[in-house]
Structures are given as structure tokens and as C-alpha cells.
């Protein structure tokens, strides 16, 4: 296997581009704070985690033992006994959401799917793929679902088995839907807890809330039926990945036997990247509880710093509690393109991830936003000037 000099040059140019932009992600919640150099030696192996990690597979080069450790870790993190849960390492949050909605649809074939307008765009695709009737519910100003509108819509639809897609950290505003309130509201409609399904999309905040004081409801102990977390966000990974975790007795209803690999399979994708299990295993084994707490505190402190600087300049910046997503009015296109900011309508956001570990890394961006949105204040108030 040999590349031409021209092709090698192209690869080298791309490596330089990646090196230059490695720590530039401020509009999207990918962490560059990782080091998996110990795993480089495994890159010569085709590691495929096809099927169920609980079962022996006829394909020998799998990392099931590591995947099992990862899933045990997350079952403990999200307060469900390991033996009462099942999940797997996915290709990312969208696959985890797809798996959970598929599971819910199989449990409640006539159900409608309810989610807020702040929910990740993948859910629109999932509803179409699974042919699930769906209702997009308006959101409150902070990004949470409008609880009254949710109840009203379920009542109007006469839905006895609704599927609730809850945001545990919404994409643009980092909003956390109140799982406790949703359950209380559904009880007022006469729905028993066993008659509906709650999925928690915790792509980013799933690795934040377990490490803060007095978090809002987010776990199985709080009433969810499944949860997804991204591996390339707070954890950090060179390859997009994630986990999905659900209740064992529910998953058993969709299991199938696969002769080709001599194993059971409940996953969506079939062949799965076995290297992702090694990345996630290395991350959880190399970080203690206090390490995660420190990492989360750093992110929230940097978010606070960003809010304070923008507010001091008269810019309406804010963040939800326990969120590292800072929301503010959308700057001009040259600014949001320069800094790769995510925008939606009239707002933009900054996501302070672990690799942004000093205010100096944020100041150039903040200065540009201030000059763009509040130019009169910006003159003479740039960091470093008297």
C-alpha cells in the first residue's frame, strides 16, 4: 500500500489544517481534550463489535470485554442496576436516539412521538424513518419544552401511550426538560407510568449533570426509560461515538438471533466500530470522579466568564443552569463564520468545552463579538487595554 507523492502531500496539508483548527471548536460541543496515544498500536486491527457484547461472537476480533466495562460504568452513572439494563456503544447520538425511539415504537405501536422545537434535528428524521406520528411542541424562552402545550396536545390526541423525547441539554440553548414535571403532568391526565415512554437525549449534558451539585432529574432513578450520551463531546474521541442505555426487560422484546455471527443482536447498525469501545474505556479508566468534577467545573466557569464579559458590554448573553452553552444575539456573518459559531434564527452560541481551559483562548472571540454587537463599548475595553 503506497501513496503517490502528490497524495502524501495532500494528506500532510490536511494534517496541518487539522492541527491548526484542533482547538478552534467553540460553536460545537466536541472536546479536543484527549490523548489516546496508548491505543495507536490497535489501528492495524479490524476490530468489529457486531452484535451483543453479552454473547460470544464467532467474529474473534471484537472488544466486547471493554464494551461491557463501559456499559457497566454508565449504568452506575445513570442509576440503574447493571443487570437490569442493556445498551451498547453506538456511532453517535443520532443512532442512540433512533434505537430508543424504535424500542419505544415496538413497545407502543400506536403511540405518537412528542418532542420540543428545540430538539436535535435528528428526531425529525427518526420520526420519518420509523413512520411514527409525531408532534413538535413549542418551547419556552429558555429552550425547555412548553409543558402545558405538551399536556394539551397529548389530551387532544387522546394518546394513552405517548412517547416523550426529553432534552437533557438542548442543542442550541442547553435546556433541560423537567422529567419530574412531565411525569406529574401526565398523571393528571390519568396515565399510569407504565403506559408511556420517556427517552432522555443527554448527548452533552449526560457527562455534566452526574458531576454537579443538586442536578435536576436526568436518570433512570428519576423515571427515564432510555438515555443517550455522545462519546466525542464531553468525553472526547477522535471518532464520533456514543452510548445508548435502556431497561433490559424492554430491550428483550426486540432481540433477534443472527446465524451469520452465531450471536444475538439488538443494535441498529450491525457492524460497529470496536475501536470506539477502547477509546471510551480508556477515558473512563483514566479519569476519577474528582477528575470529571474538575473538568465540568472548568467548563461551567469558562461559560460564566463568557456570559459576564458579554453582559458587561451590554449584550444579552445567558446560559441555563448547569449548562456550558452560552446563548447571545447572532453576530454578523463574517464573525460567526470566522469563529465557526453555530447559529439558529436570531441567536448564536458558544460551547465551552474542556480544551478551552483558559480565558485567553476565549478572549479573541469575545472581543470580536463585542466589537460586532456593541461597537461603542468595544472601543477601549478590549482585554489587555487600559
From Swiss-Prot:
Alphabetized SUPFAM superfamilies for the sequence: PLP-dependent transferases
GO molecular function annotation: histidine decarboxylase activity; pyridoxal phosphate binding
Top EC class, one word: lyase
Keywords: Decarboxylase, Lyase, Pyridoxal phosphate
Cofactor(s) listed: pyridoxal 5'-phosphate
Family: Belongs to the group II decarboxylase family.
Record note on quaternary structure: Homotetramer.
Designated name of the protein: Histidine decarboxylase
Gene designation: hdc
Amino acid at each position: 500500500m503506497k501513496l503517490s507523492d502528490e497524495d502524501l502531500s495532500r494528506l500532510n496539508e490536511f494534517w496541518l489544517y487539522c492541527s491548526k483548527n484542533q482547538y478552534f471548536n467553540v460553536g460545537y460541543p466536541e472536546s479536543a481534550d484527549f490523548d489516546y496515544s496508548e491505543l495507536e498500536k490497535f489501528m492495524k486491527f479490524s476490530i468489529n463489535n457486531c452484535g451483543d457484547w453479552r454473547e460470544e461472537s464467532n467474529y474473534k476480533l471484537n472488544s466486547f470485554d471493554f464494551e461491557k466495562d463501559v456499559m457497566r460504568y454508565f449504568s452506575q452513572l445513570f442509576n440503574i442496576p447493571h443487570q437490569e439494563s442493556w445498551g451498547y456503544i453506538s456511532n453517535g447520538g443520532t443512532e442512540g436516539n433512533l434505537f430508543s425511539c424504535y424500542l419505544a415504537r415496538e413497545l407502543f405501536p400506536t403511540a405518537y412521538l412528542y418532542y420540543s422545537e428545540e430538539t436535535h434535528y435528528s428526531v425529525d428524521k427518526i420520526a420519518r424513518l420509523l413512520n411514527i406520528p409525531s408532534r413538535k411542541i413549542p418551547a419556552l424562552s429558555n429552550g425547555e419544552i412548553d409543558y402545558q402545550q405538551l399536556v394539551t396536545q397529548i389530551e387532544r390526541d387522546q394518546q394513552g401511550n405517548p412517547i416523550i423525547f426529553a432534552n437533557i441539554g438542548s442543542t442550541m440553548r442547553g435546556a433541560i426538560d423537567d422529567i419530574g414535571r412531565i411525569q406529574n403532568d401526565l398523571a393528571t391526565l390519568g396515565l399510569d407510568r407504565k403506559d408511556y415512554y420517556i427517552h432522555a437525549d443527554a448527548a452533552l449534558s449526560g457527562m455534566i449533570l452526574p458531576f454537579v451539585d443538586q442536578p435536576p432529574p436526568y436518570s433512570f432513578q428519576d423515571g427515564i426509560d432510555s438515555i443517550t450520551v455522545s462519546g466525542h463531546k464531553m468525553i472526547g474521541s477522535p471518532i464520533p461515538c456514543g452510548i445508548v442505555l435502556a431497561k433490559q426487560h424492554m430491550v428483550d422484546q426486540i432481540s433477534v438471533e443472527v446465524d451469520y455471527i452465531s450471536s444475538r443482536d439488538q443494535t441498529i447498525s450491525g457492524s460497529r466500530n470496536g475501536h470506539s469501545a477502547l477509546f471510551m474505556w480508556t477515558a473512563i479508566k483514566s479519569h476519577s470522579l474528582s477528575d470529571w468534577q474538575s473538568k465540568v467545573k472548568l467548563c461551567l466557569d469558562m461559560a460564566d466568564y463568557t456570559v459576564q464579559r458579554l453582559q458587561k458590554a451590554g449584550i444579552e448573553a445567558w446560559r441555563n443552569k448547569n449548562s456550558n452553552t452560552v446563548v447571545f444575539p447572532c453576530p454578523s456573518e463574517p464573525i460567526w463564520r470566522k469563529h465557526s459559531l453555530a447559529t439558529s434564527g436570531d441567536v448564536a452560541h458558544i460551547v465551552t468545552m474542556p480544551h478551552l481551559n483558559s480565558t485567553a483562548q476565549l478572549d479573541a472571540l469575545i472581543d470580536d463579538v463585542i466589537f460586532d454587537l456593541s461597537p461603542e463599548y468595544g472601543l477601549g475595553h478590549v482585554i489587555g487595554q487600559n
